[in-house]
């Protein structure tokens, strides 16, 4: 399934010309914010597992089966190839190979559709994409599950197209707003940081 949130009639025509039984597309007209667009895809999905592939990712093989297999473990609530861990605080995150992490980046992100619907999907206040994936990962994990990195998937990651298409000052403003929104809810929840959990176990 492809969610067309571009507002570009040429893309809509291209997708319509490639419509097939195994390819469905949803056109959002007028375009919505990032989170609302993702939620439209989640609502329209038919499978038990939803895997988000950002337009900045190219598949070079079967990246689906390994992600579905990982989610057969009921303790795993979100998985993907690109993980993040808080650097001692929810205010700063860095890439991590895991295997257990604090959040999965939205470039490629797999989760159960039922879990997403129980949370009412991504927070629609995140109209810009930055931090929305981290916030969604935290809400999934807050229900008692784990975020897990699945390495070596056949993917090629490119620059994020929306990031490149947005004016630098504007993307900085939108990113800061999303981070403040995230911290309003999760800034006082260091218990969700995997690294700090490990430090506490080692200490005691």
Regions found by a protein language model. Name each.
Residues 1-27:
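Acidic donor-binding segment of Leloir-type glycosyltransferases
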Residues 11, 38, 61-64:
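Acidic donor-diphosphate engagement hotspot in glycosyltransferases and nucleotidyltransferases
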Residues 28-45:
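Glycine-rich, basic loop-to-helix element that forms the pyrophosphate-binding segment
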Residues 35, 92-114, 129:
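A recurrent flexible, glycine/aromatic-enriched loop bordering the glycosyltransferase active site
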Residues 50:
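Short aromatic/hydrophobic "clamp" motif used to bind/position activated sugar donors
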Residues 58-93:
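Conserved donor NDP-sugar-binding/catalytic core segment of glycosyltransferases
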Residues 66-67, 106-120, 125-154:
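A short, conserved alpha-helix in the catalytic core of glycosyltransferases
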Residues 77-81, 85-88, 97-99, 110, ...:
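C-terminal, non-catalytic tails of nucleotide-sugar-dependent glycosyltransferases
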